[in-house]
Amino acid sequence: CQRLELRPMSEGAMTNLLVEEHTLSEDQAGLLARLSAGRLGWALRAIRDETILEERTSELEHLQEVVDGGLELQFKYAQQLTARFRKNFEAVLALLELWIKWWRDVLVLQEGSPEAVMNIDYRDVLEQMAHQFDSNEVIDLVRELIETQKRLRENANPRLALEVLMLAIPRKVKTA
């Protein structure tokens, strides 16, 4: 048995392949290539199963609502995530990973590297958020997201871990 290391496919090569072989528009192919981070299998699953991108859209809309909402909404969301966690541990960890990528994009824009944004279909919203939040608080939130994933994997109380996470969501410091 030999371990085989595979490198991610380049974004340009994947975009071309998806346009030519799967008749996607350039924009659709570019989005899938960016979101897949070079994993062709993920991009092909997203083409076959439309719910993958639909669920992502729904989760990102929830994220924006939670960020804009107050503590009451955030704690209610933590309660919903706790119930979901008890049914599907991996789905909540994947959601936290999506949040990490989202806030990473906010940081990338704050640092002036728009070409590195992963969620290119939400570029306008991300740019707005990059101007509304303090970068140190965003960094702290990303750290807390990573810690929350770790705590949940280590069997911490999910409700407590998720409520602590909600407290780490930064407050807007500027209006767009």
Enumerate the language-model features and the residues they cover.
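Charged, glycine-rich active-site and insertion segments that engage polyanionic ligands
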Residues: 2-98, 103, 109-118, 122-176
